[in-house]
Amino acid sequence: TLVHGAALTGGLLQAVSHATAKAGMFMAAGLIYAALGHDRIADMAGVARALPVTVLAFALAGIALMGVVPSGAYLAKKLLLDAAAGSGQWWWTIVLQGGAAFTAGYVVLVLASVLRGRAAAPPVIQRVSRRSEYATLVLAISSLLLACAALGPVPGALLSNPLAPLELGTTLL
């Protein structure tokens, strides 16, 4: 049925989107740790000045994990919420929206610390390669734009065919 197709598509899209965003976020955290020699959030003031590409990747991956448009997590969450509503399983709304709120909380906590001003950037004990920084950024951007790959440019695909995500789900069955 349409509801099961939406749930299947939403679940698969959630898995791929979450994996790419989380990989980008953990890679960014690893680069920050490698550069500073610690992972204490309270001591990260000025990191954005020292590692701007890495912090941008962390922020974009966090936005993707929150499920903001046009991320794959947004489309996945929409499909899963629609499927839950269609099958009377309203409690999934609490789980999905609670997860997004929790994600927003920890992403904002880290970003508030790394973006906090400081006269100078914190001491970098080891330089990280630009290639690693850009690989991290590519993962974050990929997750952020995953819904566009599934539907085409958003919101055009949704405006022309609001059932496009549901029809995509039924083709997978």
Language-model segments: residues:
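Predominantly late transmembrane helices and immediately cytosolic-facing juxtamembrane segments
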Residues: 22-26, 90-132, 173
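Membrane-helix interface motif
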Residues: 65-80, 146-163
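Hydrophobic alpha-helical transmembrane segments of multi-pass small-molecule transporters/permeases
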Residues: 11, 15, 31, 59-65, ...
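Alpha-helical multi-pass transmembrane bundles of energy-transducing inner-membrane proteins
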Residues: 1-42
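Membrane-interfacial loop-to-helix junctions in multi-pass transporters
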Residues: 5, 48-57, 87-92, 131-132
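Interfacial segments of multi-pass membrane proteins
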Residues: 1-3, 76-92
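Short amphipathic alpha-helical coupling elements at transmembrane boundaries
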Residues: 42-49, 116-117
